[in-house]
């Protein structure tokens, strides 16, 4: 046949339209897990930064599967999650139009990296954000107003959220402006939630107090951007035959004469990537402690691999660097490029599948160089294999001289 098929299924999913750029590169939490007063008080989300990927070896615990009790190699993503600081608390009341914020109470002391978020140009600003509000915590009249706000939260609100920010100073990135996010508190009564939030103002929250090993969570973020792309790259439509006039990577028919307009369902060129997406059911394989602490100095070791090493590959993660703070290891790939802010949220659904309850037992984590084909797992292993190099002999000669 010299012509194309007369009928063909449409290309591209309409569920993600319109394919436009996200308003911000921080993943927005549009829904929180359902609250249960019988459970202990806990936060439902956390912020992290995508560092890169590696692979692991583990034993599968899945009776009935062909790979049960066998070793498998799986790809994992590393999300660096330094401790977050609670800077405020806000309460929401139920209205016919949905939840509405009643009032917000900020902490007495806000760090400079958090106050930078409220300015577009910190260097040229007067840097007076929250200076007047902080005086409320110092005089008697201001304290009465704050106590009244806390009482108002306990009396009228149906849900309580804390305002937390990341710590860019300990992350050692070029950016100095912290990221702020509202995180809902679940569990307990409203009074207990308000008291918990008040006790934790200006205090750090660790990621292992929010999530646990083997838990299924959701990742929210913005995908990698590709700019303005053609219809074949954007919608994966079939290329036209070679002899087609005026181009092959196009849609030949974009609609009938009447109605005299192009339907929104027709594939067209435009923005590709930098879309806001939510990926559900990412399983946590490990929550590692900071490599700067005694507990986490060997956070890349396992029960079977006793090598003293951190999670960092040799030379660090390409285009990211070293992961020195707490981290979360997730199964598979995560959306977005390196250094992209990733919002981690507790799952909205009740997990009933067997894969969600499988216990993960890591046997080995790859820490070879991710630039090229890495051969060695640690610097000590490479030094033992290579022996003394020329620079070592030169250094010894200089020391003797």
Curated annotation (Swiss-Prot):
Organism field: Caenorhabditis briggsae
Gene Ontology biological process terms, A to Z: translation
Name of protein: Large ribosomal subunit protein uL3
Major localisation: cytoplasm
Domain of life (superkingdom): Eukaryota
UniProt keywords, alphabetically: Cytoplasm, Ribonucleoprotein, Ribosomal protein
Family: Belongs to the universal ribosomal protein uL3 family.
A GO CC term attached to the entry: cytosolic large ribosomal subunit
Function: The L3 protein is a component of the large subunit of cytoplasmic ribosomes.
SUPFAM superfamilies: Translation proteins
InterPro entries from the UniProt entry: L3_arc_euk, Ribosomal_L3_dom_3_arc_sf, Ribosomal_uL3, Ribosomal_uL3_CS, Transl_B-barrel_sf
GO MF, one example: RNA binding
Subcellular localization, as worded in the UniProt entry: Cytoplasm
Pfam family, one: Ribosomal_L3
Gene responsible for this protein: rpl-3
Chain intervals for the UniProt region annotation (Disordered): 1-21
């Amino acid at each position: 046949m010299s012509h194309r098929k007369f009928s063909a299924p449409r290309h591209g999913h309409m569920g993600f339209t319109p394919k436009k750029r996200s308003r911000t590169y921080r993943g927005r939490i549009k829904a929180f897990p359902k609250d249960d007063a019988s459970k202990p008080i806990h936060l439902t989300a956390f912020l992290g930064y995508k560092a890169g990927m590696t692979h692991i070896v583990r034993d599968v615990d899945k009776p009935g599967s062909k790979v049960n009790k066998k070793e498998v190699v799986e790809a994992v993503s590393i999300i660096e999650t330094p401790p977050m600081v609670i800077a405020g608390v806000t309460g929401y009341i139920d209205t016919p139009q949905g939840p509405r914020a009643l009032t917000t109470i900020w902490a007495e002391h806000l760090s400079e990296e958090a106050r930078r978020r409220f300015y577009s140009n910190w260097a040229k600003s007067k840097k007076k954000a929250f200076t007047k509000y902080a005086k409320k915590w110092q005089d008697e009249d201001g304290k009465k107003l704050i106590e009244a706000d806390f009482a108002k939260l306990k009396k009228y609100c149906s849900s309580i959220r804390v305002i937390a920010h990341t710590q860019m100073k300990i992350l050692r990135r070029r950016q100095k402006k912290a990221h702020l996010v509202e995180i809902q508190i679940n569990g307990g009564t409203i009074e207990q939630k308000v008291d918990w939030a008040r006790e934790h103002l200006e205090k750090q929250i660790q990621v292992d107090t929010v999530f646990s090993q083997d838990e299924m969570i959701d990742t929210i973020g913005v995908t990698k951007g590709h700019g303005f792309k053609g219809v074949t790259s954007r919608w994966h439509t079939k290329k036209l035959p070679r002899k087609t006039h005026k181009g092959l990577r196009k849609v030949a028919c974009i609609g009938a004469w009447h109605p005299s307009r192009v339907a929104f369902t027709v594939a067209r060129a435009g923005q590709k990537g930098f879309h806001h997406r939510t990926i559900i059911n990412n399983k946590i394989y490990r929550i590692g402690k900071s490599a700067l602490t005694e507990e986490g100095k060997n956070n890349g070791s396992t029960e079977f691999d006793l090598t003293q090493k951190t999670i960092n590959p040799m030379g660090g993660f390409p285009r990211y660097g070293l992961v020195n703070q707490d981290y979360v290891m997730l199964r598979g790939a995560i959306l977005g490029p390196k250094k992209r802010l990733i919002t981690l949220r507790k799952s909205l659904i009740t997990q009933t599948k067997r894969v969600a309850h499988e216990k993960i037992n890591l046997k080995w984590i790859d820490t070879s160089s991710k630039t090229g084909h890495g051969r060695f797992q640690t610097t000590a292993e490479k030094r033992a294999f290579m022996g003394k190099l020329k620079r070592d002999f030169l250094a010894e000669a200089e020391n003797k001289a």
